[in-house]
Regions:
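A conserved beta-strand element that flanks and buttresses the S-adenosyl-L-methionine
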Residues: 124
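Short catalytic micro-motifs in class I SAM-dependent methyltransferases
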Residues: 127-131
Length: 222
């Protein structure tokens, strides 16, 4: 199993060595950031989330999970939410977000250790879930489901393996999953796919990126 090779310390050591800028966050592919953010904005708009246009309302509170330096927080989430919380284990990445208008709480912890105490309208996860094992990802999604406000969404945006199986990357100690594996884990976590699509406009020589909007199969009642 590819995910059995994941080592959280190795992953933290890798990211701690990376520059706190967009190029560092995107592994040298900073030129895809604009297209990525626009694709995410368009995806949310199709779901009625956003601050522009008829029928597209801002949500009250979102959380950027595995936020890094806040590229997505600043480039997207603060435009569609009044407040954005941050979950990111590397402190140097979040230093520039402290005190920024619209940024709420900052949790410097890994996703596997985060226990949300706030109810969110939007939980955003991008290019970070590969650092969780399959079992951790299922547990994490179950926690996210319980932390959603009524009508809330969990968004997952990740690279897709094209080899038909999950692939371990020893450089940052992460796994690139295939679409089938994600769907299997979503089902185990009792999350259903409300909408999904492939990100358009990326270079052909990089892995395809798929975005999913998830909702709980059953509405959680306290």
């Amino acid at each position: 199993m590819a995910d059995s090779q994941i080592n959280h310390k190795d992953a933290l050591d890798y990211w701690a060595s990376i520059d706190a800028d967009v190029n560092g966050m995107l592994g040298g592919f900073s030129f895809i950031s604009k297209v990525d953010l626009q694709g995410s904005k368009n995806f949310l708009a199709k779901l009625g989330v956003g601050g522009e246009g008829a029928g597209k309302a801002k949500v009250k509170i979102a959380v950027d999970c595995g936020a890094g330096i806040g590229r997505i927080t600043e480039g997207l989430l603060l435009k569609v939410a009044n407040t954005v919380d941050i979950v990111e284990p590397i402190v140097k990445f979040t230093d520039n977000l402290k005190g920024k208008e619209g940024v709420g709480e900052i949790f410097n912890t890994g996703l596997e250790n985060w226990s949300p105490e706030t109810e969110y309208d939007l939980i955003w996860n991008q290019w970070c879930l590969g650092h969780l094992t399959d079992a951790q990802l299922q547990s994490y999604l179950e926690k996210c489901a319980k932390a959603l406000n009524k009508g809330g969404l969990v968004v997952v945006k990740e690279n897709m393996s094209t080899s038909g199986e999950d692939v371990f990357d020893e450089v940052d100690s992460s796994v690139t999953r295939c679409d089938e594996k994600f769907r299997e884990i979503f089902k185990k976590a009792r999350m259903k796919i409300k909408k999904t699509e492939i990100q358009n406009g990326f270079p052909r020589d990089i892995l395809p990126v798929r975005i999913y909007a998830l909702v709980p199969e059953v509405v959680i009642v306290d």
